[in-house]
A protein has these predicted regions:
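Alpha-amylase-like alpha-glycosidases and glucanotransferases acting on alpha-linked glucans and related
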Residues: 1-59, 84-210
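Conserved, well-ordered alpha-helix/loop/beta-strand core segments that scaffold catalytic motifs
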Residues: 51, 56-84
Length: 210
């Protein structure tokens, strides 16, 4: 368990801390707002250890399954959502990587414009990435995210792949009307070139629908 915690500290610590905070009834908008003594108290709580152990046990069993499938000549394809939830450890621990206002509320949300699937478009409610902030950190959050999932899968399908090229920005005061959104430019190949510099080519399947 300790080895797993050390190898996955970059995401597991924040994830377990976030869930421990919620389980104990606390409501703190971002990790940076937690006082040091409170953070130490939460980390020592058995709830924190429980959430770490659940992840350890899940990936232990998952990797056993993957190994068995690979031995039988079967590969596993992961399916990665493009966006994350506002109510997540990702946003909570890294608010600077999302388009949020001073009170840490989304200034815009994700969705799609009107098309033949929906005359009114779609408003998903997910917070949008701050791609300028991501670029300053060499897309480290995304690079690690892709690398992690490829470690546990033989190939990775990324949903809403077109969002890397451009994405539909719906102002937060218009979240009920996706028609009032507009297109914004995404990171494009820059993100994947950064990934390749660190990890080489990747077996990625791009959703070609939307």
């Amino acid at each position: 368990v300790e080895q797993f915690k050390n190898e996955n500290h970059y995401w597991l610590y924040d994830y377990a801390l976030y869930l421990t905070m919620k389980d104990t009834g606390l409501s703190i908008k971002s990790k940076s707002m937690i006082q040091e003594d409170l953070e130490k108290k939460l980390v020592k709580d058995s709830t924190f250890s429980f959430h770490c152990f659940v992840q350890y046990e899940f990936y232990k069993q998952w990797n056993d399954l993957k190994r068995y499938c690979n031995e039988k000549g079967i590969g596993l394809i992961g399916d990665l959502p493009f966006y994350v939830s506002y109510d997540s450890s990702d946003v909570w621990a890294n608010p600077h990587l999302y388009l949020l206002d001073k009170s840490l509320e989304p200034i815009g949300v994700a969705g799609t414009p009107p098309d033949y699937f929906s005359e009114e478009g779609q408003s998903w409610g997910n917070p949008l990435y701050d791609w300028k902030a991501m670029k300053k950190e060499k897309y480290d959050w995304w690079v690690k995210r892709i690398a992690f999932h490829l470690k546990h899968h033989d190939a990775l399908r990324i949903d809403h792949f077109r969002g890397f090229e451009k994405f539909w920005y719906i102002p937060n005061d218009e979240t009920t009307d996706a028609r009032k959104g507009h297109w914004e430019k995404g990171p494009g190949l820059d993100l994947f070139e950064q990934y390749e510099r660190q990890f080489g080519s990747a077996p990625i399947i791009a959703e070609d629908l939307g």
